[in-house]
Amino acid sequence: MQTPQNYLAVIKVVGIGGGGVNAVNRMIESGLKGVEFIAVNTDAQALLMSEADVKLDIGRETTRGLGSGADPEIGRRAAEEHRAEIEEILKGADMVFVTAGEGGGTGTGGAPVVAQIARELGALTIGVVTRPFSFEGRRRASQAEEGIQELKQSVDTLIIVPNDRLLQISDETTSMLDAFRMADQVLHQGVDGITALIVTPGLINLDFADVRTVLSNAGSALMGIGQGAGDDRAEEAARAAISSPLLEASIEGAKGLLLSISGGSDLTLHEVHRAAEAITRAAHPEANIIFGAVIDDALGDECRVTVIAAGFDRAAEASFARPALAISARESDSIRLPEDDDEDIPVPSLLKERQEDEDLFQPAQVGAGRNDEGDDDLDIPDFLKG
């Protein structure tokens, strides 16, 4: 008689390039559990500083461990050279996250290669990437768009973080390093929001099969994470999750929804109902809604809601700006939300249509007085490059 075994989903997070490895480091520092961390880079020195479980320096023959020089083609070739090693590292994974900062060399060129290998191995493959700040220059922005389109073909689901939106919810004293840390934090919340649905035992269980149902071959997806406290904590958390200033599009029209509500042991059925109702009202009437509830006494009197929306109609997607990851609309240590009287910063609302105004995507003035013709020459420190 065979001994019964408990089978847990194997989740691996691959950070590739400077931005991806930085994001992985932040996830490790934040105590993200239940996943294996893998750092991949052409910059051997930066790789040494990572606390990832597995480290792989790629492109040794091409770059001699000195980085890709912000050239995506070098990043792609470096990953291809080590295809067999990447495949060995990813074997056995049920889900693979590929995280990177788009616009540089290693992340932009190498992420599609890693994602392709993961899918060939049968893993549910999720891309979580950043679109660069405008102050990083037109060339980097152009490379990022090309990289995003290529990565989209290699993953099941792609979540994009628009870095310029981080400037809209920060103040003028935010340093460049703090801006990049904010981007890392959002990448972390993107991965944490999905893995928590799987690895945290639930009062109403959400398992890996549920996540696969919504995210397999889903294309672009939206994700929101919100927290609330007080009498209306669950509904407040739900509204925060779907109305973050970082959210570039509404979840309206989503035909696949993953909804997870976490709270203390005093979480009531009515609270759960109100939170779910606030979100499902915005979704497609025939949406496939998969729901989970988790009791986590560590939250105290707070409630946390995680929403993943996918399966948008192609026609609807064409009218949206590119989807993005949303984080809680509550103020945190590293991300400061705008004051109530700050009317210059647009905050999307569940109850009103988002205005399609190009000015929404313009960042706060950074480096005023800089010669615009030379913005491609902006020197980003090596450890921040992809």
Residue map of PLM features:
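Tubulin/FtsZ superfamily GTPase core signature
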Residues: M1-G386
